[in-house]
Regions:
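Signature of exported/secreted
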Residues: 25-350
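Bacterial N-terminal signal peptides that target proteins for export
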Residues: 1-10
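C-terminal motif of bacterial Sec signal peptides marking the signal peptidase cleavage site
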Residues: 19-22
Length: 350
């Protein structure tokens, strides 16, 4: 789902803050010993325990059945490029997307797996491409059927509007499955005049599939470590992925900064930092050599989570990648520079 500028780069940067598992190595280990523990009363209060070492939190997702959460997600991306393709002038592209959607807790299994009924109510997109001597701007609103609404680029957005589908999420915040998209696909096929054969339909479903929708929604769901975490303690995780064609190791550091109890509700705040290590800075294929000559990357984020309600209430992340690449072939070479920044802002509206 959801086309982005510099897709390969953006995938890495967005997912960096959302793929949080419990297998990361912690800088401060959480003691699971329950001796001398004191628990508060209230819904999900057993997730917060005080002992002789401090306040310890089990980071679990425990909403109540039939609860409904309404969210706004804003994703802003700015890409700046200087290359021979842009006439060695700076080309600036921006994409500003707002998603409005709801999640209803449809079922909670015996193992704690939560099934949400999800529905997108509105999506609007502002895209701009500008250089020193020209600028092009386009605005899409899923609720306004204008000339932009009918463009092929937006079929995927139109097709999912107001259609219910389902997401299964583990107690640790990882989306394990997206299903129930049959009506969405039916809308897509109809918008193309039902002219597609079986192979073309499968190709379209693959390009706008469960994985793409899951990647968007996972940005909201915060993934937690398996072990309990003390206030002011940290944990880390690293995993390998790619930026463009270059293999990298993303190193994620998290810190439980705050725990509050107010009006019989527990809320926590987590701070996050991202560092990127390029494992290989030169790649050769049959036609060309790609070499990173300069790279600066990183990111930060904060997450506010309501333990009592079992939901993210706010999340802000920002990432930056600044990279210079030398392309060589047949004794000739050119240089390109690209800077991509992303800002993600998620708010619980209700």
């Amino acid at each position: 789902m959801f086309r982005n500028i510099s897709k390969e780069i953006l995938f890495v940067l967005f997912i960096s803050f959302t793929v949080l598992t419990g297998c990361g190595k912690k800088e401060d280990s959480a003691d699971i010993n329950t001796k001398n523990e004191k628990k508060s009363g209230g819904v999900n209060s057993d997730l917060v325990v005080k002992d002789d070492k401090g306040t310890k939190v089990t980071l679990d997702l425990r909403p109540k059945k039939n609860d409904v959460f309404k969210y706004k997600m804003n994703a802003l991306t700015t890409s700046k490029e200087i290359s021979p393709m842009s006439g060695d002038k700076e080309l600036v592209s921006t994409q500003d997307i707002n998603y409005y959607y709801s999640e209803e807790v449809n079922d909670i299994g015996s193992s704690g797996i939560i099934t949400y009924k999800v529905k997108f109510d509105s999506i609007n997109i502002t895209s701009t491409v500008s250089s020193s001597d020209s600028s092009v701007k386009m605005y899409y609103n899923s609720n306004v059927k204008d000339s932009v609404y009918g463009k092929p680029d937006f079929i995927q957005y139109n097709s999912i509007m107001n259609e219910e589908f389902f997401a299964r999420v583990t107690p640790k915040g990882e989306i394990s499955e997206i299903y129930g998209l049959e009506k969405v696909y039916e809308n897509m096929f109809k918008s193309l005049g039902d002219t597609l054969d079986a192979a073309q339909k499968e190709s379209l479903k693959s390009s706008f599939g469960k994985e793409a929708i899951q990647a968007v929604l996972q940005q909201q769901f915060q993934m937690f470590p398996d072990a309990a975490v003390y206030k002011d303690s940290s944990w880390t995780r690293s995993y390998e992925t790619q930026i463009m064609i270059f293999p990298v190791r993303n190193i994620l550091s998290y810190r439980l900064n705050d725990i509050k109890e107010e009006n019989n509700q527990f809320t926590i705040k987590i701070d996050a930092d991202l560092a990127v290590d390029f494992m290989k800075k030169e790649i050769k294929d049959e036609k060309m050599t790609y070499k990173i000559e300069d790279a600066k990357t990183g990111g930060k984020g904060t997450v506010e989570f309501n333990l009592t309600r079992g939901c993210v209430t706010a999340k802000q992340t920002s990432t930056n990648i600044d990279i210079g690449i030398k392309l060589s072939a047949g004794g000739q070479s050119v240089k390109t520079t690209q800077n991509v920044t992303t800002a993600l802002n998620i708010q619980l509206l209700k």
